């Protein structure tokens, strides 16, 4: 189906992609919903347009391109390394603007030199934006999920709390709520009278008794176990929730995490600052810092202007599949995000790839770029 109402710069943008050694691909507008619901993150999940096939399969209008491009790569058994480019419509509910809009971008799959690939993708995004917005000063914000994960692991947090914090990475308010919860452990009573009662009866320490109690309660209230989670699933989730709520992180560890999340400085200064932080906090995060250092060095070798880039330790993006680098690009002095991306090394394996495929990429919001071009002309 031909694309209509494309921005005037679309042809030049595609030519830029071709010069960056990419293969242009398209994907169906109607997509299986499950991969997005499982892997895309809560922020995107609640904005997806859902539908259903005649056979009952959950489907959705394409809300983004990364997952469809990766699925296409797996289905066509294309070798790697491979760089894909795309331009097409995506569909998601937005607070501002149309729910149907154009995105374009590059997905860089299979390069084992992750630092070089990260630098290349950031450079690609800066290149195509600079060509659309000559004379405008860009600003680049970078974060690193792998460094964040290394810090919370080194602080000694239980796995359940690590998952919660990783899930909240990039959401400053949610991270603060979770840190506040870690500073103020709760008793089972905060979850209601019923949970307090089963705790008093010792059922939280006896999973079989708890499972039987939940099963009897479900049966008595007419709740079908086929309609949702099983009694055992509910019991395990309840135990985990109560156990996590009772955990307190000592003041020193909380101070370390807050000191890390407060780091916000020019990217060129970030490696030294992170090493100082790790040394002062006595955290063994050498592997994560080595990867971070390699990426900063690769960006310098690629000729990226360090004056445009800033590292924020608390910066993340609202998609669950990111594993390392995350970044956004806009115009200095304006709030609009024109490009965003990052590394997603686990995604292709989760989607069914038979081997590990490192991956990194970015997306462009063409409507926002069009508005930025118009604003520049009006000045």
Curated annotation (Swiss-Prot):
Pathway membership, UniProt: Amino-acid biosynthesis; L-histidine biosynthesis; L-histidine from 5-phospho-alpha-D-ribose 1-diphosphate: step 1/9
One family name in Pfam for this protein: tRNA-synt_His
Principal cellular location given in the protein's record: cytoplasm
Listed GO CC annotations: cytoplasm
Any one GO BP annotation for this protein: L-histidine biosynthetic process
Cellular compartment(s): Cytoplasm
Keyword set, alphabetical order: Amino-acid biosynthesis, Cytoplasm, Histidine biosynthesis
Role: Required for the first step of histidine biosynthesis. May allow the feedback regulation of ATP phosphoribosyltransferase activity by histidine.
UniProt-recorded name of the protein: ATP phosphoribosyltransferase regulatory subunit
């Amino acid at each position: 189906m031909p694309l209509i109402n494309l921005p005037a710069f679309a042809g030049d943008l595609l030519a830029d992609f071709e010069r960056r050694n990419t293969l242009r691909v398209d994907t169906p507008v109607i997509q299986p919903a499950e991969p997005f619901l499982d892997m895309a993150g809560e922020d995107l999940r609640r904005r997806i347009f859902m539908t259903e096939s005649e056979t009952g399969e959950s489907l959705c209008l394409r809300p983004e391109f990364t997952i469809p491009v990766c699925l296409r790569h797996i289905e066509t058994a294309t070798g790697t390394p491979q760089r894909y480019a795309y331009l097409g419509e995506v569909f998601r509910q937005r607070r501002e603007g149309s729910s149907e809009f154009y995105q374009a971008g590059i997905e860089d799959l299979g390069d084992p030199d992750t630092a070089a690939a990260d630098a290349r993708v950031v450079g690609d995004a800066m290149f195509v934006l600079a060509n659309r917005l000559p004379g405008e000063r860009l600003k680049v914000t970078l974060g690193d999920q792998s460094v964040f994960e290394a810090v919370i692991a080194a602080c000694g947090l239980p796995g359940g709390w690590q998952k919660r914090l990783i899930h909240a990475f990039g959401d400053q308010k949610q991270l603060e709520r979770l840190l506040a919860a870690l500073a103020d452990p709760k008793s089972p009573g905060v979850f209601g009278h019923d949970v307090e009662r089963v705790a008093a009866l010792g059922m939280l320490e006896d999973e079989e008794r708890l499972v039987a109690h939940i099963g009897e309660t479900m049966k008595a209230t007419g709740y079908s176990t086929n309609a949702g989670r099983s009694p055992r699933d509910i019991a395990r989730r309840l135990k985990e929730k109560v156990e996590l709520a009772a955990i307190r992180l000592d003041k020193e560890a909380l101070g370390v995490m807050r000191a890390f999340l407060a780091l916000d400085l020019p990217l060129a200064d970030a490696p030294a600052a992170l090493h100082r932080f790790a040394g002062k906090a006595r955290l063994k995060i050498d592997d994560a810092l080595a990867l971070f250092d390699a990426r900063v060095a690769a960006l310098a070798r690629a000729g990226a202007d360090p004056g445009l880039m800033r590292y924020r330790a608390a910066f993340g993006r609202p998609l669950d599949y990111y594993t390392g680098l995350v970044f956004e690009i806009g115009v200095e002095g304006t709030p609009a995000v024109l490009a965003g991306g990052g590394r997603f090394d686990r995604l292709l394996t989760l989607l069914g790839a038979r081997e590990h495929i490192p991956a990194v990429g970015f997306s462009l919001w063409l409507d926002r770029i069009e508005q930025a071009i118009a604003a520049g002309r009006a000045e």
